[in-house]
């Protein structure tokens, strides 16, 4: 793993989580310290943003977001001093036994799910209190190319276990389960050597299969419970957090360090089929990250954020990495599987590989007809976009992409219906 120096400028979008966007707490011209809170929102589902370098705020303006669109961002000119902000002191031993103190620290440190979903961790744990009896830490890391979790386990085993212990205490539980695929035996052995039982943690070696790292698959593997269509993990008494989220909890509580960096993987044929694992500050533009890896061997045709199966397409190299960026993959024609006229040949492979036992070929058909009633009937909203159907489709149908689009359409329809209902209610009030 390589720690890369932060860039001359960091670009910090105010939206790095699911929920309410943050609002800037600083103005252009302000000097900020590394770790200083620079944006926040009091809404329950939100997480503050912190300066990842010290320096001067030179802009607060729309900038490219890694997930698309232009999003308000705070731009800081790095003074290369890393002058620390000391607002978050390490928790005392007494506070580390207090669930409320831990939850408040997780929230103030801006910690969100590092597995990609970016759900605010404090809200997730708090929402499970009284409902959840099982805390699972996801160490499967089943996506090809990605190695950040594996390296975190090897480099910080004891810190990880302490972070899991804190999450367990905050959840009001006596035990947590750390699910790790058996292809990471070196990390499993290292964690076992640290006596995880003293932290209330049980290491659970898991079979190596995709998509073992999906939240619902982790729950099934460890508890044999199944999340029903439309249900949530808390509905079966479970909460799942990622490896790097647990490490971020450790740093926030033991070091007083808010969430300002993570380990990510850079790889792909455009990088000469080399893989780089970098500890990188949030707000670092992709172009700078590529430079630190020696540049492209070939110009990429596709940029993927995350893994090749469940990752999202990015289009702008000036977009920065954010809290949920587990990897950046740069692909050329070598990996391009698209065809001009994809055709379903009714082979049924998509039915056999779907871990949720959905029927992708029918979901795809009903999407083509914009048949929302039947899309819902066939549980299209329960697809967690693992990509298994697309990968195995001999007709090269863009199944996973289609289902992602369908979810956006459902969300848009719901927003329209809500707006119409609110407008009708206002109209009724004026009569």
State what each model feature region is.
Residues 326-341, 351, 355-431:
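Ferredoxin-type iron-sulfur electron-transfer modules in oxidoreductases and energy-metabolism complexes
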Residues 174-286, 292-297:
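Hydrophobic alpha-helical positions that pack around
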Residues 22-31, 35:
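Short histidine-centered loop motifs in beta-beta connectors
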Residues 55-57:
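Conserved hydrophobic positions within beta-strands
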Residues 1-25:
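N-terminal, Lys/Arg-enriched amphipathic/low-complexity engagement segments
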Residues 33-46, 61, 72-78:
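Short hydrophobic beta/alpha edge segments that flank linear recognition/processing sites
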Residues 64-119, 129:
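Acidic low-complexity segments
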Residues 83-85, 113, 135-149:
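Gly-rich Lys/Arg/Thr-decorated short loops/hinges at beta-loop-alpha junctions or inter-strand turns
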């Amino acid at each position: 793993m390589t720690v890369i120096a932060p860039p001359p400028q960091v670009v910090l979008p105010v939206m790095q989580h699911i929920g309410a966007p943050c609002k800037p707490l600083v103005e252009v011209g302000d000097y900020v310290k590394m770790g200083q809170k620079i944006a926040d929102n009091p809404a329950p589902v939100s997480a503050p943003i912190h300066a990842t370098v010290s320096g001067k705020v030179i802009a607060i303006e729309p900038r490219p977001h890694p997930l698309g669109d232009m999003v308000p961002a705070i731009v800081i000119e790095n003074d290369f001093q890393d002058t620390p902000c000391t607002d978050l002191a390490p928790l005392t031993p007494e506070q580390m036994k207090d669930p409320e103190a831990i939850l408040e620290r997780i929230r103030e440190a801006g910690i969100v799910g590092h597995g990609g979903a970016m759900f605010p961790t404090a809200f997730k744990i708090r929402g499970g209190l009284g409902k959840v009896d099982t805390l699972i830490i996801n160490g499967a890391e089943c996506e090809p190319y990605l190695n950040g979790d594996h390296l975190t386990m090897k480099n910080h085993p004891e810190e990880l276990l302490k972070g899991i212990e804190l999450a367990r205490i905050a959840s009001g539980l006596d035990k947590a389960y750390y699910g790790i695929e058996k292809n990471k035996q070196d990390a499993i052995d290292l964690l076992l050597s640290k006596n995880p039982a003293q932290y209330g943690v049980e290491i659970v070696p898991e079979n190596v299969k995709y998509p073992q790292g999906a939240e619902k698959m982790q729950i099934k593997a460890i508890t044999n419970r199944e999340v029903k269509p439309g249900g949530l993990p808390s509905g079966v008494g479970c909460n799942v957090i990622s490896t790097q989220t647990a490490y971020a909890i450790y740093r926030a509580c033991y070091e007083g360090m808010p969430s300002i960096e993570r380990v990510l993987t850079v790889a792909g044929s455009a990088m000469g089929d080399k893989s780089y694992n970098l500890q990188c500050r949030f707000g670092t533009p992709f172009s700078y990250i590529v430079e630190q890896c020696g540049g492209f061997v070939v110009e990429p045709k596709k940029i993927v954020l995350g893994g090749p199966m469940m990752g999202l397409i990015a289009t702008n190299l000036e977009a920065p990495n954010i809290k949920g960026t587990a990897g950046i993959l740069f692909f050329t024609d070598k990996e391009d599987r698209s065809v001009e006229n994809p055709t379903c040949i009714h082979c049924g492979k998509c039915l056999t590989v779907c871990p949720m036992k959905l029927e992708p070929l029918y979901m795809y058909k009903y999407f083509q007809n914009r048949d929302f009633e039947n899309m819902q009937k066939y549980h299209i909203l329960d697809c967690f976009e693992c990509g298994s159907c697309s990968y195995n489709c001999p007709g090269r149908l863009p199944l996973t992409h289609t289902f992602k689009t369908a979810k956006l359409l459902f969300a848009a329809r719901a927003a329209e219906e809500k707006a119409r209902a609110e407008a009708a209610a206002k109209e009724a009030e004026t009569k």
